[in-house]
A protein has these predicted regions:
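HotDog/MaoC-like acyl-thioester-processing domains
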Residues: 5, 15-17, 23-28, 83-84, ...
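Hydrophobic beta-strand-centered segment that forms part of the acyl-chain substrate-binding groove
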Residues: 19-23, 43, 54-91, 95-102, ...
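A conserved, well-ordered hydrophobic junction motif at loop->secondary-structure transitions
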Residues: 37-50
Length: 169
């Protein structure tokens, strides 16, 4: 099965819809600079969300070879702060799909350069919608969980999505 994208550089491009292009995660590294911190020298929560959102968009595009926008964020849990000078390692993985949407689980860890040890500081689900050049939703390949852990993450993402829909979001 194929789908065509209209408009932009990809106009007329045939896209294979038989399965995802890649189910591998995306990991990115960012450094916490002074402008990223508050009066307590800790990373702004909004800056961390932006870093995580970028990783979610990257892994969604890698998964489906589409352009994506963020439609919602759910179950975001800030566990520990990150400080100026820390490195932030963000890993995003597609764990759920629907017709137009990729559910992405994102985990952020801080790396303290003095000890070179990582600790998880935040995690959550980002729901990304594939769009065409007119900003209209378009279909994406579907993710099929393999194994207990992938099924567990699928179920968590589905529960988060269902809760958002029930709340009218």
């Amino acid at each position: 099965m194929t789908a065509s994208r209209g408009g932009g550089v990809a106009q007329g491009l045939e896209i294979d819809m038989s399965g995802p292009y890649s189910t591998e995660p995306v990991t990115k590294i960012d450094e916490v600079f002074p402008q990223d911190t508050n009066a307590y020298n800790t990373l702004f929560g909004g800056r961390l969300m932006s870093i995580m959102d970028t990783a979610a968009g990257m892994v969604s595009s890698k998964f489906a070879h589409r352009e994506f926008v963020t439609v919602s964020v759910d179950a975001l849990k800030f566990r520990r702060p990150a400080y100026q000078g820390d490195l932030i390692e963000t890993t995003a993985r597609v764990v759920h799909t629907s017709t137009h949407t990729a559910g992405v689980h994102v985990v952020a860890k801080r790396l303290d350069r003095s000890e070179w040890v990582t600790e998880e500081i935040c995690s959550g689900f980002f729901f990304m919608v594939a769009i065409d050049s007119q900003m209209k939703p378009i279909p994406i390949p579907q993710f099929t969980p393999n194994g207990e852990e992938e099924q567990r993450m699928w179920n968590l993402a589905q529960a988060a999505r269902d809760a958002m829909k029930a709340a009218g979001q």
